[in-house]
Swiss-Prot record:
InterPro entries: Chalcone/stilbene_synt_C (IPR012328), Chalcone/stilbene_synt_N (IPR001099), Chalcone/stilbene_synthase_AS (IPR018088), Polyketide_synthase_type-III (IPR011141), Thiolase-like (IPR016039). Keywords: Acyltransferase, Flavonoid biosynthesis, Transferase. It catalyses: (E)-4-coumaroyl-CoA + 3 malonyl-CoA + 3 H(+) = 2',4,4',6'-tetrahydroxychalcone + 3 CO2 + 4 CoA. PROSITE patterns: CHALCONE_SYNTH (PS00441). Coiled coil: none annotated. The keyword Ribonucleoprotein does not apply. Gene3D superfamilies: 3.40.47.10. It comes from Ruta graveolens (Common rue). This is Chalcone synthase 3.
Amino acid sequence: MAAVTVEEIRKAQRADGPATVLAIGTATPANYVTQADYPDYYFRITKSEHMTDLKEKFKRMCDKSMIRKRYMHLTEEILKENPNMCAYMAPSLDARQDIVVVEVPKLGKEAAAKAIKEWGQPKSKITHLIFCTTSGVDMPGCDYQLTKLLGLRPSVKRFMMYQQGCFAGGTVLRLAKDLAENNRGARVLVVCSEITAVTFRGPVDTHLDSLVGQALFGDGAAAVIVGADPDESIERPLYQLVSAAQTILPDSDGAIDGHLREVGLTFHLLKDVPGLISKNIEKSLKEAFGPIGISDWNSIFWIAHPGGPAILDQVEEKLELKEEKLRATRHVLSEYGNMSSACVLFILDEMRKKCAEEGMATTGEGLEWGVLFGFGPGLTVETVVLRSVPIKA
């Protein structure tokens, strides 16, 4: 018998087709806050009601945020038990860590269980796990905790991504694509779970950028299952992951920073984040869609991380997008706020559900090609080219 060549081994290891999203699940904590009531609640719980001018500013931020409600694990009871979390800069990392190391994997499990149920295959067929969170750090990590909580095989190959920030919903899909396409038969469970217990803090008039975060961020977890060469007798493909790229925007150092300190995770934003993103977004689009021969940005479907309303407004204006292009993105911002890495996966879920409800021809609002954008610290941009699948009547 002739020896097998390295080329033959490599060929046998690789999948034939592109990585495909096969299922999506989402979860939120039970507790939620309405944006209209939040300024009163926030200034009361942080004992800051004497800061009347700042409260007015915060109220305007909340009014302009385009957010209707946000889910939060932190209840009034938890905050009353941990007064240091309500200060602007008080040592509170231990208390925050104690919450997130338990709650982040737990919320991730809820989303993952929904995705696995929709997928329809036994969980023993999951070969790889990618877990992503900006909330807390621990060893062994959330990837290990989730493996135990779900009862995955101990031999599942795990990847733990901490402290990536808002672009990471694109990063996890990029990594899942590489794993699925280079390991024949691989089924990758991807989980993004975010809880604001690390970033919640009281107001201060010298750092309005911190206050912006308090007006935008919410809690949520999303999970997807990614694999190539789907078994269509059981699996239901939703989107193909055609290409994935990451870049650091020019002249954007320090535009978004996060620092883990004794006081928790502090966020710093420059005012011109929307301008930096909108100015550079077309370059990323051209690089991604040039090879496919697409240059009309209204001819594709859109999933964009909703960092805040100003980013969406400026991208829409710069690219002359029709209002309906960011419908799914704006809906998720309105109903959940900015859930960091989990957002784009919530938007994918929203889009495929709406397309099915409205009888559209494909999972991409009736269109074939689409883009998924993640924006975050760096400024880092993730660009994923998606191909929708026809919706069977």
